[in-house]
């Protein structure tokens, strides 16, 4: 309903790449309707001071970026599903980053019109942050995006995300995580789409005890997610307080705030 629907893999007009610092790699970019991926090429570079300041605004450090395989990309070249070549280059005004994984890379261009580009087979099992989770833990947040995962990690929380808030959350993944974490909590954006999707996912995953926490943010473009929450000066203790407050007031599958 509304903006909350299953997200298809983006058409071949979007692709991505991965590689070691200062090197080029040639892998394959995803096509939405063909199993055979398209070729792509990407070049990494060192983070600039401006790029580190962008991540650092919500507390994300170089160590966190490194731990989660997040890199700075200088250039990306790929093909559309029709075989037409295209590419992007990083600039100070339009930086380009990559979230690397065993499957490939998801390119993130926060200041650009085309913000996300996929390279490799993301598939329905894409889950950012899963490999960094401990074998056991108390609290796990399910967020709407990679940057939110990084922000939460920078503040000492465990978190993962799927392709987007509108993606279907694989029940098999949650089923495994239930045995590893005491609390699994949806922490999505507070705009219309985020609220609709977090409630839909909460209902779909109620049998696993998944809960929902809504941040005290207005839902505007500048104030809608946990990254904005920490950028505004809120602390780890405040977020933990919100969680504890909700868990004290509400119990069972109807636990939501």
Where is each model-derived feature located?
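TOPRIM metal-binding catalytic domain and adjacent DNA-binding surface shared by DnaG-type primases
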Residues: 4-103, 118-138, 242-257
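Terminal peptide-recognition signature
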Residues: 55, 144, 152, 186, ...
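Phosphate-handling DNA/RNA-contact segment within nucleic-acid enzymes
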Residues: 76-182, 198
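Acidic beta-strand-to-loop metal/phosphate-binding motif
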Residues: 140-142, 181-193, 216
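Short, acidic/turn-prone active-site loops that include or flank metal/cofactor-
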Residues: 163-168, 189-190, 217-219
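Short, aromatic/basic amphipathic alpha-helical patches
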Residues: 174, 196-208
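A generic structural motif
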Residues: 211-221
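Metal-dependent DNA phosphodiester-chemistry modules and their immediately adjacent helices/loops
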Residues: 220-256
